[in-house]
Each structure stands twice: as C-alpha cells, then as structure tokens.
Amino acid sequence: MKDTSLPSTAGAVNKLIDSLGKLPGIGPKSAQRLAFYLMRAPEEQVLTLSDTIRSIKNQISQCRICFNVADSELCPICQNTKREANKICVVEQPQDILALEHVGVYRGYYHVLHGAISPTEGITSQNIRINELMSRLNDGQVDEVILATNPTTEGEATAMYLSRLITPLGIKVTRLARGLPFGTELEYADDVTLSRAMEGRQNF
C-alpha cells in the first residue's frame, strides 16, 4: 500500500490515517479528511464511534439459520414469523440482504453463502455455506429458491452449481432478471434495477 504518512504530522495521526486507508473505498485523501475530522469532533462522538466499532467484534455473530449478521442467536429476519416461509433468497454476503430489503419487494427468508465459488482463489463449494442451505431444504417447507448471487463469473458459477443441486429436489429455482449488468455487485445496484430484477426473476 502506498505510504500516506505526512512528515509534518504527529505519529498518532499518521497511524490513524493509515488505518482508515485500509478500509474499502477509502483512498489516501479520504483517510486524511476523516482523520482530521475525528480530531476536531467532540470527544463523546469519537468515543461512541470507538465503542460501536469494538461492539461489532464483541457482540455481532452469525444467525444460526441463515448466517446473516446477528446480535443474538437469530437475525431479525429469521425472528420474523410473518415472512413467507416457502421462499429462500440466496445471496453472497450480508450486505446484499440490506440492498434487497431496502427495495421492499421480497418477503421471504434469506441464506448467506459468505462467498462464491472461485477456483482461481481456491474457494470451493466446501468453503461457503452450501451444505447448510441444502439442510434447510430438507423439511419440505420451501418451494422456491431465488439465486441472487452477483452477476459475475463467480456468482454465475455458484448459481449454476446450486441449480444442479436443488432442481432434483423438485424445488423451483429462479434467478434474478438480467436487469443487473454483468460484473455488478448486488449491494451497489440502484433500487429500481433491484426491484425489477426481483419481480422479473426467471426459472433457472
């Protein structure tokens, strides 16, 4: 990583800039602006931020059913008994759930794989939550699985693999409509595109 340290700046500030610069989407200039903002911010605000970040590591875990982020045994979605129990939407990462929930057109449950099959990176079906998904389909409650993996090479490979596993079970397998450009990650798609992709999902 490019050295972003400033010779005329205190070591503690340089350390903060370096740490912020390691966050996704934060470049050197943004890291500097955030660091100097935090220096000027009220102490209470900075301490609240610090405590919140610490609590993520200490209090946040994975839902035992869908593997979404949770601060108890089940995530809020799996706790909601009013959702449609006959549908499971499969996504790659927890942030994909946030994107789909924001659209508000899907009322079923989710399953988070925590990745996608990628032989070039050494990620196989055993490295993501596929076995757990198959176990959820054994109770006969689910009649549709929506494959909402990202429209990337890895996402498509994962969707194809899942389709081959699930179809023999007699469960309908659908894929988000092609309104999503290839190579786009779900969390960055706009609401209208996501809504149309969910409503126009097709048999896979």
From Swiss-Prot:
The keyword Plastid does not apply. A zinc finger (C4-type) spans 63-78. Disulfide bonds: none annotated. GO terms for molecular function: DNA binding; zinc ion binding. Keywords: DNA damage, DNA recombination, DNA repair, Metal-binding, Zinc, Zinc-finger. Residues 86-181 form the Toprim domain. Signal peptide: none annotated. InterPro entries: DNA_Rcmb_RecR (IPR000093), Rcmb_RecR (IPR023627), Rcmb_RecR_Znf (IPR015967), TOPRIM_dom (IPR006171), TOPRIM_RecR (IPR034137). It comes from the Bacteria. GO terms for biological process: DNA recombination; DNA repair. HAMAP family: RecR. May play a role in DNA repair. It seems to be involved in an RecBC-independent recombinational process of DNA repair. It may act with RecF and RecO. PANTHER family: RECOMBINATION PROTEIN RECR. Belongs to the RecR family. This is Recombination protein RecR. The lineage of its organism: Bacteria, Bacillati, Chloroflexota, Dehalococcoidia, Dehalococcoidales.
